[in-house]
């Protein structure tokens, strides 16, 4: 997945990677990428943990392929040959954003001129499904049928799988997805010098902790600060009128009842603070599912179009 995803990113760059390498030093490239949960399939930690139970032996590759930062290592070793900074910041389903923040800061500080930001995760394994099901986070057939009946939808043919994940309105849970998303950040002057195809910019990335709270997984004040800070930065760039009339939100929108209520409240409070009376909100997980680490990357690339 990493190789295919990174290959697609290079193909959309608008110039050859050789031209980039001929212009900058190899140590001016940084790569921040990885998974959130770790690969629990038979090739990674799954195979490692199951081998003794199955009466077989673990492969020498199981442990290495299960590590969360392996996608960055694959990019450095097999695709770019980079000798620059490399790393990965794990933050559950905000992992891509954490890496994006590191990438932005690396360019701003001058420690890198080109940064690869991404993530790859394949969380559809029995163990991960069981874990989320135990948390009542997953949509399942029984609850889907109940919701369809409640909404006066046809239940004669069973659950409507295409609508298993409903980020907005009445919903019963999320659907897992698999994804590999990579973007290439460049120093402004370098992008213009090389004639790279520019899709957008990253003027603001924020991440804040929640302070004291009784539940680690529950939302807290940090979520409000994070969104409000980015909206404030957007207002500085666009102006108040454009912020209020020409912006939209690409929401996390997992499809769980908890996310529906908490994220809606965050957006509503921030909108009131900045005088936004009507704020279009969309989400992509009803089509792609929740891919964990690359989830924010799914949102970013679909927003760019």
Question: Where do the PLM segments sit?
Answer:
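Conserved catalytic cysteine-centered active-site region
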Residues: 1, 39-102, 135-138, 142-175, ...
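Conserved beta-ketoacyl condensing-enzyme motif
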Residues: 1-92, 120-131, 238-260
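Active-site-proximal alpha-helical scaffold in enzymes
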Residues: 2-15, 68, 72, 86-121, ...
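Short coil/turn connectors at secondary-structure junctions
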Residues: 26-29, 58, 81-85, 110-115, ...
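Nucleic-acid-interacting cores, centered on viral/eukaryotic replication and modification enzymes
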Residues: 32-33, 104-111, 129, 133, ...
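Condensing-enzyme catalytic core mediating Claisen C-C bond formation in acyl metabolism
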Residues: 145-248
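Short glycine/threonine-rich loop-to-helix capping motif typified by GTGT followed
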Residues: 211-223, 253-271, 291-299
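A beta-strand-loop signature enriched in Asp, Gly, Thr, and Trp
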Residues: 230, 234, 238-250, 260-287
């Amino acid at each position: 997945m990493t190789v295919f995803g990174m290959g697609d990113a290079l193909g959309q760059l608008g110039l050859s990677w050789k031209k980039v390498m001929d212009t900058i030093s190899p140590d001016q490239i940084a790569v921040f990428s990885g998974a959130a949960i770790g690969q629990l399939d038979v090739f990674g930690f799954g195979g490692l943990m199951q081998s003794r139970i199955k009466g077989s032996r673990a492969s020498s590759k199981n442990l290495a392929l299960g590590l969360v930062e392996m996608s960055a290592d694959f990019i450095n070793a097999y695709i770019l040959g980079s000798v620059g900074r490399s790393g990965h910041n794990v933050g559950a389903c905000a992992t891509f954003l954490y890496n994006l923040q590191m990438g932005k800061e690396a360019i701003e500080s001058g420690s890198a001129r080109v940064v690869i930001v991404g993530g790859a995760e394949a969380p559809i394994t029995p163990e991960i499904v069981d874990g989320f099901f135990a948390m009542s986070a997953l949509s399942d057939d029984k609850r889907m049928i109940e919701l369809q009946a409640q909404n006066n939808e046809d239940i004669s043919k069973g659950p409507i799988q295409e609508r298993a994940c409903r980020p907005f309105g009445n919903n019963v849970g999320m659907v897992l997805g698999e994804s590999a998303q990579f973007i290439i950040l460049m120093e402004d002057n370098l992008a213009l010098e090389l004639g790279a195809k520019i899709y957008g910019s990253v003027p603001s990335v924020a991440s804040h902790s929640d302070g004291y709270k009784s539940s680690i997984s529950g939302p807290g004040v940090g979520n409000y600060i994070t969104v409000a800070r980015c909206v404030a930065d957007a207002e500085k760039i666009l102006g108040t009128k454009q912020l209020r009339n020409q912006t939209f939100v690409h929401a996390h929108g997992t499809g769980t009842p908890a996310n529906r209520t908490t994220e809606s409240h965050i957006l509503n409070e921030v909108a009131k603070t900045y005088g936004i009376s009507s704020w279009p909100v969309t989400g992509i997980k009803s089509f792609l599912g929740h891919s964990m680490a690359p989830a924010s990357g799914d949102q970013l690339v679909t927003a760019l179009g």
